[in-house]
């Protein structure tokens, strides 16, 4: 009787904890990728601000979609277009873009920290289930 109850506990734990662990691991990886992208944007903006841009602009490679770039002429470096999600780009000053990048990186860090804590908690619960099942099998004569 106890063995059937233990098997049910193990089965229920597998059904719930493993998918939750996998989802938390994916969330952590996505948060790390997001943070890296925001930090890269912040670095590019900083580089653009530090360049001495001539009054008549500068040549640049322009992303035209699908991984294709074309040579273009940027007439000003004071405003940039930032991907704000869902395929939308917003025109911003360098200061606005830098603030957006900083906030995005902070949000991604917070999301990653939440996912990391959730992963740790799931790991603790999984360990508790394993410990319980081991002790139950020892007490039950297994």
Where in the sequence are the language-model features?
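Intrinsically disordered, low-complexity regulatory regions in eukaryotic proteins
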Residues: 1-142
